[in-house]
Amino acid sequence: MDIFLTNNLTNKKEQFVPRDKKKIGMYVCGPTVYDDPHIGNARPLVIFDILFKVLKEKFSIVTYVRNITDIDDKIIKSSEEQNISTKDLTEKVSKNFLDDCKFLNCEDPTYQPKATEHIDLMIKMINELIDKGFAYENNKHVYFEVKKFSDYGLSLIHI
């Protein structure tokens, strides 16, 4: 069985040919847990669950990583509006999201890291981007300098 996926850069269907047929890696941006899950959260959840199941049928090892963003401006604002801690808010909303996953019969990802578990690494990576000139600070935010990276969108792995 061949697998074809749409390449967003060319907008054409292309055969999926992995670099290593024994190990497939799949990273999916998960929810930002500031409010109860909605249909917009369910759509990518179901689509990538189907892809995960198809890939597992064809390949030996499929590693599926889906993060949970449990700290950001929306979370802080929502926790302040509800007068609860960000931790209490994100735990409640994460539980609701995971309950919805089970209800939709979606398999658990191989790994489900939370943003707060990797803050130190993120700070280190952000500082490296700033040091290399790929990012800059403005008004207490850090922005990626797209113009400084000619292959932006093609391959960010080499930064």
Regions found by a protein language model. Give the residues of each.
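NTP-dependent nucleotidyl-transfer catalytic core
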Residues: 1-158
